[in-house]
Amino acid sequence: MKLSNNTVQVLKNFASINQNLVIKEGNEIKTMSAMKNIVAKAQVEETFPKQVAIYDLNEFLGCLSLFKEPILSFKDTSVVITEENGSSGDSLEYMYSDPSVVTTPSKDINMPSEEVKFTLDDVMLSKLSKSAGMIGAPDLLLENNKLTVR
């Protein structure tokens, strides 16, 4: 299986919420912060053939980055990562974690319908995150001045 760029971006985002992740069979990925106060869910293009428990998601993403076009083969206890064209013969076997040591949402949370809806593109979010990091701001406040969200 080849992961789309969108799925890799979802995994990178989820790594900022929690370093570990359980991907269940199917095309839905969910994560929850260790404090259990942030939950995220995404539908991805790929359908995962089996449950995969990853203890360190950033480490796993780093392993993927070792390959130009990584192909994932899901085994019983590991995922084998190879190059798409297979010419180099390089491969990496990444062992699954024990799911019992990984923080994962056990059930879906039914959220009320949104009160406010807006679009925040990745360029603006990156700029806001970088600015907040530079001044050490732990939170981000969005205000509506009826014209723009700032």
Where are these regions (language model features)?
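Conserved mixed alpha/beta catalytic, RNA-binding, or beta-rich assembly cores of soluble enzyme
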Residues: 105-107
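DNA polymerase processivity clamps
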Residues: 1-95, 111-150
